[in-house]
Design a protein with these regions (language model features):
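Exposed, low-structure sequence patches enriched in small/polar residues
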Residues: 1-212
Length: 212
């Protein structure tokens, strides 16, 4: 699916930066703004697996004022990914995916970064009443100066419940790899920011549920 949007009047923030402080003033302007977006998805069953390809492309052109300097900006991003999952009822549920991303911003300065993301999840029911789950994600960001950050997170759980039994027992292990921080790059309308999120350490939880 392709989408094209053009605006002849836009509301954008007029940005003023003083030291560590930033002041945003929304203003209505006659500056044009154009946006192209293309999204596509193709899936194919191969033997007992399902293969899916995804594409997301976006190009945005707009005018931005920062510290009384007005520039024509381009903010673009492209993502291409695939996923493979089992499609056979007698097999465990397994899904793995990879996404490659490219991001560019030009205006007062030019910058870019790329990303590599892997996601996987697994679910297995065994001995009738037991269910095991595993989730995994990693993300690597690399900027235009070839500097990179990386994080990976894994969560797992095992659940036991008999049929028609109101009791359910489950053990969770969150942040199994004991990752300390989560890093990510993002674009505002005029700059790149690196966000660092501190995450809870590895934790184990025992859950007992009674369903009325």
């Amino acid at each position: 699916m392709a989408n094209y949007t053009k605006k002849v009047q836009t509301t954008r923030n007029k940005v003023e930066i003083k030291g560590i402080n930033q002041y945003n003033t929304p203003i209505l302007t006659n500056n044009p703004e154009t946006n192209w977006a293309i999204n596509s998805s193709i899936s194919k069953k191969i033997y007992r697996f399902s293969l899916k390809l995804n594409t997301h492309l976006n190009w945005l052109n707009y005018i931005q004022t920062v510290n009384k300097i007005t520039t024509i900006n381009d903010k673009n991003n492209q993502k291409i990914g695939f996923s493979l999952k089992t499609a056979y009822r007698k097999w465990p549920d397994f899904n793995i995916g990879y996404t490659k991303g490219f991001n560019q911003l030009s205006g007062l300065t030019k910058t870019a970064y790329s990303s590599d993301e892997i996601n996987a999840d697994f679910e297995l029911t065994f001995l009738k009443f037991w269910t095991y789950k595993m989730e995994y994600q990693n993300l690597k960001n690399t900027n235009s100066m070839n500097q990179s950050n990386f994080y990976e997170v894994a969560n797992t759980s095992i659940r036991y419940q008999k049929n028609n039994n109101p009791f359910e027992f489950e053990i969770f292990a969150n942040n199994l790899l004991d990752n300390k921080v989560k890093n990510n790059y993002s674009f505002s309308d005029y700059m790149t920011t690196e966000q660092i999120t501190y995450v809870l350490p590895r934790i184990f939880i025992l859950s007992v549920t009674y369903k009325l």
